Amino acid sequence: MSFTVIIPARYQSTRLPGKPLADICGKPMIQWVYEQASKAGADRVIIATDDSRIEAVVKGFGGDVCMTSPNHESGTERLAEVIDKCGIASNEIVVNVQGDEPLIPPSIIRQVAKNLADSIAPMATLAVTIDEEEDVFNPNAVKVVTDAEGYALYFSRAAIPWDRDAFAKGEALTANPLLRHIGIYAYRAGFINTYINWQPSVLEKIECLEQLRVLWYGEKIHVAVAKEAPAAGVDTQEDLDKVRAILAL
């Protein structure tokens, strides 16, 4: 199976400026992500950035970097530019890995690529079961429901499916585990251009979830339970401190 990993990395971050270059045990965060992705068996791992500081650091550790426009409105537009600049064939599988996940397991990068290769969908992603009831009601924990074949029916920040009877009886809503979506995607490269030429849908604007555009226009997204539950990404200084402690062991 052939696939390419693209890792978007932006310097600007509201809560943690310069996040991709944050030092973690002697290496910048983006290098940790790059090295994890490189263990997944991809043909190529590319870091996409619009910042010369990140470009210089990536070249310094021997990584493959593609400079992109600073004017993209979404990460998907950035992917399209990388696919075009790097000459990635339309039938190639591209896995988008977030640049703030230094602990991402290589196994799930390969898993989502293989799931796409084995499916009829133009796009695939992963989920994990929700074990904590607080996540059921947390709008930042995006829920997903699928059909019998593992294709997404809907993604929502609300609690879906809603167990009416369990709620009425005061029972735990995790008895029949909900699925929490995790932010890793695999695409057939040619589908990216199709996607960015669609107008944003009403549903994605309401939920603030880009992937709903795919379902709105009648395409499929394959969803599987991740073989390994990934650690949380780095959004804050507290997150960064936790990752440093883990990798220092």
From Swiss-Prot:
Enzyme Commission number(s) of this protein: 2.7.7.38
Gene Ontology CC terms, in alphabetical order: cytosol
Catalytic activity: 3-deoxy-alpha-D-manno-oct-2-ulosonate + CTP = CMP-3-deoxy-beta-D-manno-octulosonate + diphosphate
GO molecular function, one term: 3-deoxy-manno-octulosonate cytidylyltransferase activity
Principal EC category: transferase
GO biological process: CMP-keto-3-deoxy-D-manno-octulosonic acid biosynthetic process; lipopolysaccharide biosynthetic process
Assigned keywords, A-Z: Cytoplasm, Lipopolysaccharide biosynthesis, Nucleotidyltransferase, Transferase
Pathway(s) this gene product operates in, as recorded in its UniProt entry: Nucleotide-sugar biosynthesis; CMP-3-deoxy-D-manno-octulosonate biosynthesis; CMP-3-deoxy-D-manno-octulosonate from 3-deoxy-D-manno-octulosonate and CTP: step 1/1; Bacterial outer membrane biogenesis; lipopolysaccharide biosynthesis
Role: Activates KDO (a required 8-carbon sugar) for incorporation into bacterial lipopolysaccharide in Gram-negative bacteria.
Family: Belongs to the KdsB family.
UniProt-recorded name of the protein: 3-deoxy-manno-octulosonate cytidylyltransferase
Source species of the chain: Aliivibrio salmonicida (strain LFI1238)
